Structures are given as structure tokens and as C-alpha cells.
Amino acid sequence: MNGNVVMKAKDTVFAALAECFVTIGTRRYNFMQAINLEAKFEKNKTEVPILGKTGKGNKASGWKGTGSATFHYNTSIFRQMMLQYNETVEDIYFEIQISNEDPTSGAGRQTMILMDCNIDGGVLAKFDADGEYLDEDMDFTFEDFKMPEAFKDLEGFLTN
């Protein structure tokens, strides 16, 4: 494989070098409590029968956005959302902005903004007499997203 271009180890993005902001209404929070977050885009597909073929085709027919996060149990902003829903039946939608940037990587910076996020539920109260620290998990959905900053193509990635 002489001449094969390979990725440089330094171009990986260090996992902890990220920023996360949550915007609820007019308030923007530096969500430094986050331990991890993952947002997924899943296309809905419809099977399409095609005359003259033994197999079926697949046509995209929409999408859904889902996510999950784990964060330190030291903020009440999501419990306040649940309390407001319980008291008023008004559901709260919010934005999450995630940026990944490792200054030692040639990939640069990527920023994703998840819009119209909505929590599925959450922890109201918690303790662990045998634990070291408290954290909590949260699942959520989102209805739109944008990417104002994209990673750069690494050297050798684009071949034509």
C-alpha cells in the first residue's frame, strides 16, 4: 500500500474539548454540568414496490431527531421545566448548541444547534449514600437543527 494516505493521530478530536449551551426562552446557560451528549438523526423510510424487480426500493419519508445526555446532578433547570408542565400543562421547548474544537487537530471546529428540543422526562429527586457524585440522564427530541460551523476536510480526505 505504498502511497496510501492515512489520518494523523493528532487530527482526532479530544472528547472532553467541547462546549454546550442551553437556551430556554431568553436565558442562555453555559451547560458545563454536561458529562456527555449525543444527538441522532434518523430517516423514516417507506418501502416501495418496483415493477420488474424482486426487491423493494426505499424512499425517505421524513426524519426524527432524538438525543440523550448525562450531566452532573447540580442544576434544577430541567426539573423546573417538569414542574411548570405539571402545574400548567405548558410544554417548554429549548435549544442546545454543541461545539467541538481541539486546537491540536487539523479538523478545526464544528458547531451544531438543535432546535425545538423537548425533554422526555427526568429525575425529580435523587441520592446515593454509597456513591461518589450524583449524575442524571435525560432523553430528548428535537425538531430541527443547523450546522453553522463544519469540520475542515483533513489532508488526503478528498481524492478528486
Question: Regions from the language model: what does each represent?
Answer:
Residues 1-5, 149-160:
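Intrinsically disordered, low-complexity terminal/linker regions enriched in Pro/Ser/Gly
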Residues 33-36, 87, 106-121, 158:
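Surface-exposed flexible segments
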Residues 82-113:
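Short, acidic/charged, Gly/Pro-enriched secondary-structure junctions
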Residues 83-88, 133-135, 153-160:
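Short intrinsically disordered coil segments
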Residues 141-144, 159-160:
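Short, surface-exposed polybasic-and-hydrophobic patches located at secondary-structure transitions
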